[in-house]
């Protein structure tokens, strides 16, 4: 048995200079797993709670010593002597110990860090890579694929201090034959975008996720400069490379309207969906995430009606990796894809349940980082293990982002043909 003999929590730093939670799970026999919880900037209101201390004298209230104390106390006591390979049982023990709907007693950051650390310790005990262990937990052993990266090369919204309203402008190297080639294509486009911005006298500082964050006259201008960068890199837009947006529309939804203050436009719900549709007609945008506010379900129904059979409509704040909310979306035919962020729900077991529910309903799955990240690369293993098909982990800059890409390179090298890169067919509506 992979007997747990110690659980340790500590406060570490994330990529934005804020504290986050790291956990270690130690097993009999010297096996150890270590994992860290990420943190979001644009967060859905129904996400599991990230427990912060609120003590303004430390880290402006963002300390996580309470969550760490919960790991070193109640969680450790509850898990001592348990089998680390019994992931669902461990996660349920922590969920029951917390006893709240959104994990606000122990903190989703505490529970998640321990959940992932236990999975890593169990993989070490079994003598297998983390992705292989997660695939077994998922009931899909040996069924792997390399994900198409959604590379956030131009940032706006909550991820940047500029006047661009849409939060993320991404490229997807759908024409690549392997993940390694996809990564190279993305890097070449990223460097060419820097040159394009410099030639225009625009800022080349980067945002939270490593993408450039210039001031531009409109959101369409962001697409225009990316188009030039793709062509300068020697690729065909729409053929080799497609585009994706994360609107994070909840961030500019005010009093029932969508206020694009950066370009001085205000839309009602259907009007904003029509605006997005017009962008898809001008550019090869094949995926739009959070194109409306998380509570605007009538608007989502309209957006799905006009765009859902043509492109991928991804629910992030809409679904918050929560099977209860996702099942309602499936029932009402809202969106056709889900973004998976395991700190939105707070455990590996619940994350895998959301992935299975989405796939069973014919929704696509995009595994995602958060804007506040660490060097922890667990999402790379998760994407391959579940054959999710797509991953969103930032730009080709900042080691907190590149750590995930490098782990995917290692995994592809290990698995070879057992983990195919399927490109365009992974994206809803593009097969």
Curated annotation (Swiss-Prot):
Active site positions, chain numbering: 209 (proton donor), 341 (proton acceptor)
Alphabetical list of Gene3D superfamilies matching this protein: Enolase-like C-terminal domain, Enolase-like, N-terminal domain
Cofactor mode of binding and number, as noted: Binds a second Mg(2+) ion via substrate during catalysis.
Needed cofactors: Mg(2+)
Gene name of the encoded protein: eno
CDD domains: enolase
Reaction equations catalysed: (2R)-2-phosphoglycerate = phosphoenolpyruvate + H2O
Role, per record: Catalyzes the reversible conversion of 2-phosphoglycerate (2-PG) into phosphoenolpyruvate (PEP). It is essential for the degradation of carbohydrates via glycolysis.
EC numbers on record: 4.2.1.11
The protein's name in its UniProt record: Enolase
């Amino acid at each position: 048995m992979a007997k747990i003999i110690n659980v340790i929590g500590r406060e570490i730093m994330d990529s934005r200079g804020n504290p986050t939670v790291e956990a270690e799970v130690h097993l009999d026999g010297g096996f150890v797993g270590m994992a860290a919880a990420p943190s979001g900037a644009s967060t859905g209101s129904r996400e599991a709670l990230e427990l912060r201390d609120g003590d303004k004298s430390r880290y402006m209230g963002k300390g996580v010593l309470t969550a760490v104390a919960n790991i070193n106390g109640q969680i450790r006591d509850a898990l001592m002597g348990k089998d680390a390979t019994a992931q669902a049982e461990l996660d349920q023990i922590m969920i029951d110990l917390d006893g709240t709907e959104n994990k606000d007693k122990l903190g989703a950051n505490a529970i998640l860090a321990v959940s992932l650390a236990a999975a890593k310790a169990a993989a070490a005990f079994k003598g297998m890579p983390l992705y292989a262990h997660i695939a077994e937990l998922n009931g899909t052993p040996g069924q792997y694929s390399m994900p198409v990266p959604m590379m956030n090369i131009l940032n706006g919204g909550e991820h940047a201090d500029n006047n661009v309203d849409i939060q993320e402008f991404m490229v997807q190297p759908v024409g690549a034959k392997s993940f390694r080639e996809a990564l190279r294509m993305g890097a070449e486009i990223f460097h060419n975008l820097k040159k394009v911005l410099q030639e225009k006298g625009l800022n080349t500082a980067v945002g939270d996720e490593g993408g450039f964050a210039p001031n531009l006259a409109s959101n369409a201008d962001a697409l225009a400069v990316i188009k030039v960068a793709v062509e300068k890199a020697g690729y065909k837009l729409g053929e080799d490379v497609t585009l994706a947006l994360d609107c994070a529309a909840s961030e500019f939804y005010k009093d029932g309207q969508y206020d694009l203050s950066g370009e001085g436009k205000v839309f009602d719900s259907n009007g904003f969906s029509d605006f997005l549709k017009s962008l898809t007609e001008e550019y090869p945008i094949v995926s739009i995430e959070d194109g409306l506010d998380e509570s605007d379900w009538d608007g989502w129904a309209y957006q799905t009606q006009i765009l859902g059979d043509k492109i991928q409509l991804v629910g992030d704040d809409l679904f918050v990796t929560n099977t209860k909310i996702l099942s309602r979306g499936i029932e009402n035919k809202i969106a056709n894809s889900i973004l998976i962020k395991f700190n939105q729900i707070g455990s590996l077991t619940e994350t895998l349940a959301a992935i299975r529910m989405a796939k069973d309903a014919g929704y696509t799955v995009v595994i995602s980082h958060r804007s506040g990240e660490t060097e922890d690369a667990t999402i790379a293993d998760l994407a391959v293990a579940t054959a999710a098909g797509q991953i969103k982990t930032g730009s080709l800059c900042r080691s907190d982002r590149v750590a995930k890409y490098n782990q995917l390179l290692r995994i592809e090298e290990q698995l070879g043909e057992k983990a195919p890169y399927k490109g365009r067919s992974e994206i809803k509506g593009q097969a």
